[in-house]
């Protein structure tokens, strides 16, 4: 009599497993191709897409020093005079 009570449970379990294998096992594994991925891609920089090229920042011209800092840009302003004694080296005087 014990086997008679367990048989509906075993039958129900076997039926549920069969239904589960039919629904879950029938699906195919799908892969994504390059066509579906390529739609969201930013076009590469080149002669076909020049607008997508990122422009490099340029180095703007900047003088090394300004006239007010006296960087010897104005050579007429400075004079050189050499004082040579017998034992001394030449001395440059800037006026």
UniProtKB/Swiss-Prot annotation:
One of the record's GO molecular function terms: hormone activity
Key words of the record: Disulfide bond, Hormone, Secreted, Signal
Record's GO cellular component terms: apoplast
UniProt cross-references to InterPro entries, sorted A to Z: RALF
Intrachain disulfide bonds: 45-53, 65-71
Lipid metabolism in keyword set: no
Function field: Cell signaling peptide that may regulate plant stress, growth, and development. Mediates a rapid alkalinization of extracellular space by mediating a transient increase in the cytoplasmic Ca(2+) concentration leading to a calcium-dependent signaling events through a cell surface receptor and a concomitant activation of some intracellular mitogen-activated protein kinases.
PANTHER family per the UniProt record, alphabetical: PROTEIN RALF-LIKE 15-RELATED, PROTEIN RALF-LIKE 16-RELATED
Similarity-based family: Belongs to the plant rapid alkalinization factor (RALF) family.
Protein name: Protein RALF-like 16
Organism: Arabidopsis thaliana
